[in-house]
Each structure stands twice: as structure tokens, then as C-alpha cells.
Amino acid sequence: MPFKAYPTEKRAQERVRPHRWEVRKSTHGKEIDEALVGNHRRDSALRNDPLQDHLTPHLAKNPFSCKSPPVDTQLLVADFEDWRETVTEAVALLEQGEVVALPTETVYGLAACAFNAEAVAKIFKVKERPSFDPLIVHIGRKSDLEKVAVVPEEIRELVDELIEAHWPGALTLVLPKHEDIPDLVTSGLPTVAVRLSAHEIMREVAKVHGPIAAPSANRYGRISPTSAQAVMDELGGRIPLIIDGGACRDGLESTIIAPTMTEKGPVLRLLRPGPVSKEDLRLIAKVERVRNKPGATVEAPGQMASHYAPATPLMIVTKPGEFVPEEGKKYGLLTYRGSGGACLIDLTDWTATQTLSPGKGKLSEAAVRLFYCLRQLDAAGVDLIVAEPVANTGVGVAIMDRLKRAAAAHP
């Protein structure tokens, strides 16, 4: 069944729209502009990046700095009745070693050829991403898995079952990497994260061009983009092309698992919760949640303690009395159904309010709206975003994971 594109709140009025953005400072070296990075303390992460040697030789050839002229970013609206032009435009740039923003069913991705280390280096530069945080490789068909990964015989049946159940879809598998995949893609790890997207455009581009590395199309640590306009706000002037494929269907980054075989049988190590829930995965094998300890090796994207964060501090309020408003401060409220929750009911003077699932209380709708609502509150000029928790079940586990990491950005 064809992927359904959901309309964005602000569709482009023209098929191609240029955008220019003034770059003020180096985006990967030590000169991190706090206004650009949202005060997420990423400068220290970059200074202490143990895998910087993987990145430096490639960055030196195409430095992105204050001396670099801004790029004319084109916003190309996909024609879902005939998207050959869309695919052709994206593939042509990828073959030139450029990066492009592409829609997926989860969030928009920033794509580059997975086998071209110099092109992959541009992803890290544009996103201001430390090289110890690995990327996800997107393939265009199931059979392409063997081009980027090696499936051990002991888990082949398990992997086949996962692929049959959840590909194309929002499930990423961490497997031993193929020798052709550059170390930069995997942050020097012997494993690679792979998925087959359910979005026609991402999948078709990967079919025509070949496997592509594509993390979320935003600056590192910030809110993931679920619309083309959000990508433009984040990366306009830094990349040549954004494909507008509508709002993302799932709204949260993919679930990441590492299939393994133990003495007691197959186990799915859950590295990042996402749209494919723990309950879904348990139908196939035992699931073990992996919680990264401080200083531990990052095994997959999205494991940093601070991530997915607005520039505005965020606080999750779970009990009455946890939040006491200060006079003269402006507050934004992120509610689940719209009531504000029992602990917040007495505080009604909110500068801005966003509701994840108005009146319905549906976790699936809350997941789709999460990043949009956070962006709206972040732009509202408040001093603090107060977030109400959601049920820690199904996709609610992934929602709470994102909120906790967003809150950790401003301890």
C-alpha cells in the first residue's frame, strides 16, 4: 500500500523555494556559538570527542566555517503522483557527494552516500554532531541489507522474522557492519544500524542511489524535525536541498534494537524506544532495555543523556508541589489531553499551551505531535516549559524517553 503523505501546516506555495541563512561561526570546531546550539553544552562533547580523528581528515577538505558562503537551500515539494523528478534531484546531489534532507515516516533525515566518507563527514559538520554518535544507514530494499551488514548465522532466523514483521517500517537493526561501510558512519564501532523506511521517497532514493546514511535533519541535540519547514528552520543555508514529503506519520525516531543469541535463547536488546513498541517486539523474542550509564560507549543514535531538546529549559512535573511558579517568569505548558494534569490545575496563567492529544488521550497522536508541540513552545518566548508525563506503555515509553532527554539538557 503506498505511503500516505500527511499535509504540512505550511506547504510551500512554489515548487522550488530558495532560502539563505547567515552562518556566524564554525559549526564543528571549538568555536560553538551558544545561540546556534541552544546552550546544550555540546562544545565540551566536541572537545572530548575520542573519535575526532575519523572526522578531521574529511572535514579539512570541505570546511564549514564563518568564511564559508551561505548555501542556497531549495525546498522541493514532492509530487506523489509522479515523484521521479524529486528522486532524480536528490540522487544527483548525493552522487556529487552532497547532503540532502529527505522525509521518512519517523522524522526528516539528513542523507549522504553511506560509502562516501567525505560526504558522511558533511553530515557531522552540518549537524554539529560529535563523531562518537553513530548514524543509521537506510536501504532501498530488503536484499540490500547484505551490502551494509553481515548477519551472523546464529541470529539469521531472528533477523528474518524481524524484517518480515517490521520492514518497511520504523525499526532499526544493529548488526555487524560490512567492510565497505566507513568507520565514520559507525563511529568506529564494529556494528552498523540499518533500516528500511516506509516512506516512498526515502526508500526510492535509496533504491536508485544505493544505501544512504541519514540521521535526523536538525542540529545536534535539538528537536527532531517532522516537517520540511522545521528542517528549513534548522538547516536552511547549510544544505542544498530539502524534499518536502509532508508531515511525518509516526513523529518519533525509529526503535533501535540489537538482535542477539544468548545461552537462554534469542534476545532483542532495546537501545532506543520508538514507534515499534516493546510489546510489539515481545511477540518475536525476549526484550531487554539497555540504559546507558555515564561514560559508557554509545552503541546507537539517541543514547546521549541530553538529546531532542528545545533551547528553552524543560521540566517534567509528575507530582503536586514539584512545580512552583515564580513571579515575573513566563511558562509554557505541554499537556497530554488538555487538562494540565491534577498537579497543574491551579496554575492557569500560562503564556503558551500545547496539547499532545486534545481530548482523546491517544498515545499514537501524542507521539506524532510531540516534536511539533515542543517547537511551538520553544518559539513562544517562555522561561520554562512544564511537561505533563504520559502513560509509560506502548509508544508512551518512547515519548517519555524523549521528554526525559530533553529535560536533561538543562540540569
Region locations from a protein language model:
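N-terminal polybasic/positive-inside topogenic patches
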Residues: R42-P50, T56
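Serine residues within intrinsically disordered or low-complexity segments
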Residues: P18, S26, S44, S65-S68
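Active-site-adjacent structural elements in enzyme catalytic cores
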Residues: H58, P63-P411
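Alpha-helix boundary/capping motif
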Residues: P7, E14, E31-E34, H40-R41, ...
